[in-house]
Amino acid sequence: ALSRVYADPENGEITITDPAQSLDLGAVGKGYAADAAAVRLHELGVTCFLLDFGESTMVCAGAPPESGGWTVAVREPDALLNLSGRREVPEYSGTLTLADRCLGVSGDYQKYFASSGTYYAHILEESTLYPARYCRAVCVLAPDAFAADYLSTALFAQPYAAAREAAENLPNVDVLWIFADGSREMTPG
């Protein structure tokens, strides 16, 4: 539980008192690294690029010549989740055209384990510490990868109504939810 995690801001340290517990920075680590790489490319004078940090985090700067942006496919969650433990050939539910935007995707199909025909995803709901099951995936477009990465995880772990309300109050952020029944909801934008 988080009650066993202590932060010391003065020394920049975090202590975990339970040796069986660990912290995973997956919700923000790739976004932070992607932003740092993008800053370095800009410092070197590179203005048009796409950085793909493992399917769930992307930085799209500029646009390829004679295009409106980078075309990025959104995976169909059901095409990837297979309870036998095998990964199927991915299918795509649509594409996005991105220029000077970052994409963060969190889903229950990316990291999980299966037991007795039930799968357990890697993103936990804070109040129960059990896998969140409000939707199958959340895709976030934001000005920076850190925000896109963080927000996709945070919005995934909340009930849809609360997540939608939070998302609609975020400037320059667009969100797509994909639900278990295949339906989709998007913020205006």
Q: Where on the chain are the PLM-derived regions?
A:
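Mature catalytic core of soluble alpha/beta enzymes
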Residues: 1-189
